């Protein structure tokens, strides 16, 4: 086996021969990362990406200055979807090592699950993987129900059934109950709702290849909230939380839904489909109805929902929407504590009325007259949250996945958002 390359940290600048902008230098003993105190975690992550680019696949994090956050920053940049990498971790105290191990187990699960090809990961497989992950960290404190196919239609989950019926792989709703109290009557503290579209062709509003080639990742919201619940459990979550994953393929077939179809939801809302590529909100609506019925203190939904959020924020931030200023502030504080990028975008009462239909109460997409696509999508979802003005957060997961590598990240999933949501759940 190749000897490990030693990676050490220094607060001194690199030798002048490396240039004044050098963030790392190479010597006979290995590679030194030169921290400047401005953005040390980002510097470590970017350096790790460069080290991986050199073809170095076995490293040892050595010397002083390493902690769980710095080790994790290195791994975020070093990990990539192709090939294998080995890291020999530094000595950490028990709490720091446990934190690092939990991140490696759970957030790597999120990244690997999002990166999985759609042929391998259908709606049923996604739901089962989520059950397996949560059960692994919570054992006997978890119960769950999986509803699929025609049972969804019979039980009134019309959004999920409508979107998923065009695929040979049946749509699936996972309802998972994490109840550490052991009391079946214990109140539900929070509900997490995730969009789990395991492949999104756009349906009859078909995507171009350039927009479809990454759509195996359209279940990123479901993976993120699953990982968040698992991670919160490892951090000692002692309150009851329910997880709802709305899983389906959005494909074209003789049985697929069409423009002009009208969906009637269990809360009485009627929605006209005018864009089959705005399917995420249609499946999330079913999950939000179930979440509202639990009367929790908070509901958090996460979805790779709109291109508009990516237009606004790129792949660098998750977009946050809420009518509840206090709760939004708490999530942003959690994001700051976890060093994860979130940015709040506008959501106002008027966005709820910017989806007019001539044939139903709501249209599932905006129009040229109302171009704020990410905000109107959030406004659409609010119609399925019973008390939408309090206790509800919507996360449009624009930072979940990168089609191409950048200086800090390989191509593929990032795992961003897991720690922030877990932090909020355990605060």
Swiss-Prot record:
Mn(2+) 1 binds at residues 200, 277, 279. Binds 2 manganese ions per subunit. The active site is at residues 207, 281. It is an enzyme of class 3 (hydrolase). It is found in: Cytoplasm. InterPro entries: Leucine_aapep/pepB, M17_PepB-like_N, Pept_M17_PepB, Peptidase_M17_C. Its cofactor is Mn(2+). Keywords: Aminopeptidase, Cytoplasm, Hydrolase, Manganese, Metal-binding, Protease. Mn(2+) 2 binds at residues 195, 200, 218, 279. It catalyses: Release of an N-terminal amino acid, Xaa, from a peptide or arylamide. Xaa is preferably Glu or Asp but may be other amino acids, including Leu, Met, His, Cys and Gln. Its EC number is 3.4.11.23. GO terms for cellular component: cytoplasm. GO terms for molecular function: manganese ion binding; metalloaminopeptidase activity. The keyword Manganese applies. One of its GO terms (biological process) is proteolysis. Belongs to the peptidase M17 family. Homohexamer. Probably plays an important role in intracellular peptide degradation. This is Peptidase B. The lineage of its organism: Bacteria, Pseudomonadati, Pseudomonadota, Gammaproteobacteria, Enterobacterales.
